[in-house]
UniProtKB/Swiss-Prot annotation:
This is Biotin synthase. NCBIfam families: bioB (TIGR00433). Disulfide bonds: none annotated. It catalyses: (4R,5S)-dethiobiotin + (sulfur carrier)-SH + 2 reduced [2Fe-2S]-[ferredoxin] + 2 S-adenosyl-L-methionine = (sulfur carrier)-H + biotin + 2 5'-deoxyadenosine + 2 L-methionine + 2 oxidized [2Fe-2S]-[ferredoxin]. Binds 1 [4Fe-4S] cluster. The cluster is coordinated with 3 cysteines and an exchangeable S-adenosyl-L-methionine. Residues 41-268 form the Radical SAM core domain. The keyword Chaperone does not apply. The gene is bioB. GO terms for molecular function: 2 iron, 2 sulfur cluster binding; 4 iron, 4 sulfur cluster binding; biotin synthase activity; iron ion binding. Its cofactor is [4Fe-4S] cluster; [2Fe-2S] cluster.
C-alpha cells in the first residue's frame, strides 16, 4: 500500500462519499490505513477526572454540568491537589498512560492558573502524560500550561458549523477554533473531536470530520463521543443513532486523519462488545478507562481488560517515572498519611 499522504483540503462531498461507501469497503480502507500507521493491536488508555464539577454557565444541550438544566448533579469546587494525585496514582496503577483533568468552566480564571500549573507538574512527576480540558484558553493561558509541561489540551468542536447553533448558543464555533490555534501555538498537542447522535444529519457528521481534518495540523487525538442522554438536558429524548453510523464516523476519521489517535469516548457504557470491536477494527486506538467520564458512566476497568484479552489487544505502555520521581512520590504519600487534607481547593488561600 502506498504511503499515506496527509491532507488539509478535504471537500465535504469527498467525506460524504466515504460515509456512503459499502461498509466492507469502508472498513477495509480504514483498517488498511490504521495498520500502516499504528500497531493495530495497541490501544492508548487514558483516565479522565472531573476536577471541578457542575455550575457551568454554558448552554450545551447535551451537558449535565450546565447550570441551566436540572439534572440532579451536585456541583463541586476545584478538587484539592492530593485528591487529584491520589486519583492519578490509581489510574497509573490500573494501566493508564495518560491522565486527563476536566473542569466545568467557560474558561479558567486567572486566579486558578498557578494552581493548575502545579497540578500539571505534580501529575507529570508520577510519570504520566497529562491532558486538561478547561474551556476556552487565551494565548497566555495556553503558554502557562505548556510551560508546566501539559502534553495535551482538549477542546472539542462538537459538530458541524451548520448544526452548531442547534447545540450551543453561548460560545461561537470560531471561539473553539481560536482556542485550538492558541493551544497549537503554545507547543501543546491538540485533542479535538465531537459528539454524534445529537439529532444531526449525516452531512453534519461529515462536516465535523471536515473541520478537524482541514485544520492546519491534524489533532493529535480525536475523541469521538456517542451522545449520552441525561435526564434534564434538552437532548434527553432524542432518538438513538444507528450504531453502524458511529462505526462509519470512526472509520472516516481514521481515513482522513491517518496519523491521529482516534478515541472511543463517551457512550461506551451503552455499546456492545461487538460494536466496540468493530470500532477498533475501523481505526479507534484510544479509550477512556474507568467507571466514570466526568459525570457519565463508563465501563469498569475489569470489563475493558477482559475485552482487550478477548480481542488480543494490549494497552500502550506508559512513561516510566525516574527513580527520583518514584522516591519523591512515595515520600509524599507517606507524609500524607500523617495529616488529613481537605477534599477541595480553596482559591482564596492563594
Amino acid at each position: 500500500m502506498p504511503e499515506v499522504q496527509l491532507r488539509n483540503n478535504w471537500k465535504r462531498e469527498e467525506i460524504e462519499a466515504l460515509f456512503a461507501l459499502p461498509m466492507n469497503d469502508l472498513l477495509f480502507q480504514a483498517h488498511s490505513i490504521h495498520r500502516q500507521e499504528f500497531d493495530p493491536n495497541e490501544v492508548q488508555v487514558s483516565r479522565l477526572l472531573s476536577i471541578k464539577t457542575g455550575a457551568c454557565p454554558e448552554d450545551c444541550k447535551y451537558c449535565p454540568q450546565s447550570a441551566r438544566y436540572d439534572t440532579g448533579l451536585e456541583k463541586e469546587r476545584l478538587l484539592a491537589m492530593e485528591t487529584v494525585l491520589t486519583e492519578a496514582r490509581s489510574a497509573k496503577a490500573a494501566g493508564a498512560s495518560r491522565f486527563c483533568m476536566g473542569a466545568a468552566w467557560r474558561n479558567p480564571k486567572e486566579r486558578d492558573m498557578p494552581y493548575l500549573k502545579t497540578m500539571v507538574e505534580e501529575v507529570k512527576a508520577l510519570g504520566m502524560e497529562t491532558c486538561m480540558t478547561l474551556g476556552m484558553l487565551s494565548a497566555e493561558q495556553a503558554n502557562t500550561l505548556a510551560d508546566a509541561g501539559l502534553d495535551y489540551y482538549n477542546h472539542n468542536l462538537d459538530t458541524s458549523p451548520e448544526y452548531y447553533g442547534d447545540v450551543i448558543t453561548t460560545r461561537t464555533y470560531q471561539s473553539r477554533l481560536d482556542t485550538l490555534t492558541n493551544v497549537r501555538a503554545s507547543g501543546m498537542k491538540v485533542c479535538s473531536g465531537g459528539i454524534v447522535g445529537m439529532g444531526e444529519k449525516a452531512t453534519d457528521r461529515a462536516g465535523l470530520i471536515q473541520q478537524l481534518a482541514n485544520l492546519e495540523q491534524h489533532p493529535d487525538s480525536v475523541p469521538i463521543n456517542m451522545l449520552v442522554k441525561v435526564e434534564g438536558t434538552p437532548f434527553e429524548k432524542l432518538d438513538d443513532l444507528d450504531p453502524l453510523e458511529f462505526v462509519r464516523t470512526i472509520a472516516v476519521a481514521r481515513i482522513t486523519m491517518p496519523k491521529s489517535r482516534v478515541r472511543l469516548s463517551a457512550g461506551r457504557e451503552n455499546m456492545s462488545d461487538e460494536l466496540q470491536a468493530m470500532c477498533f477494527f475501523a481505526g479507534a486506538n484510544s479509550i477512556f478507562y474507568g467507571c466514570k467520564l466526568l459525570t457519565t458512566p463508563n465501563p469498569e476497568e475489569n470489563d475493558d481488560m477482559s475485552l482487550f484479552k478477548r480481542l488480543g489487544l494490549h494497552p500502550e505502555q506508559g512513561i516510566a517515572a525516574t527513580k527520583e520521581q518514584d522516591e519523591a512520590m512515595l515520600a509524599k504519600a507517606a507524609a500524607h498519611q500523617d495529616k488529613k487534607s481537605a477534599a477541595f481547593y480553596d482559591a482564596g488561600a492563594l
